[in-house]
Amino acid sequence: MSLKILFMGTPIFAVPILKSLYNSKHKILEVYTQPAKKKDRGQKVSFSPIHKYSNEINIPVRNPVKLDTEEELRHIKKLKPDVAIVVAYGKILPTQILNLEKIIFINVHASLLPKWRGAAPIQRAIMNCDNETGVSIMKIVPKLDAGPVLIQSKIKIYADTNFEKLSNQMSEVGSKLIL
């Protein structure tokens, strides 16, 4: 069965997961990502990795500053997605969006939940010298990273593991688990 997907993500970690979904039988309706930010001395506008990739594959992009508005609620209702997949979006979804009927909200989280709930789970696993971490696919509920875990995959952490290497590995695992 082909699903209509609303994708919500921002950093490079989310790109392989969006690619995997885009190359599947499912249809990406639209992508939500963080608004562009001004960077460096010249204050040049910089778009998120997800925004850039979405433009490459011609998927409409939306980057609201706030999600808890009537406009965003109406917009998401109008899209009629079957599922919203959230990957390091950087915004907490408001309850009124999570309560929309007929939409399942799924999160791809870079830890073996419940360990390292919240932001920076990869960094926290490395800083705490964990021997393993992993990726969790979970149903989103109003409390942060507290919904039921649907599937997990473990990943070993070695002494020479750094953030970039582990993040890339976890993103690839997430891109397979989400299907």
Q: Regions from the language model: what does each represent?
A:
Residues 1-41:
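N-terminal Rossmann-like dinucleotide-binding module
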Residues 38-80:
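N-terminal glycine-/serine-/threonine-rich beta1-alpha1-beta2 phosphate-ribose binding loop
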Residues 15, 19-23, 74-77, 95, ...:
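Amphipathic, non-transmembrane alpha-helical secondary structure
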Residues 27, 58-60, 104:
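Conserved beta-strand segments of alpha/beta enzyme cores
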Residues 16, 71, 117:
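Residues that form or flank phosphate/diphosphate-binding pockets in enzymes
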Residues 10-13, 65-68, 89-92:
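Short beta->alpha connector loops
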Residues 3, 24, 34, 83-179:
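Donor/substrate-binding cores of folate-linked one-carbon enzymes
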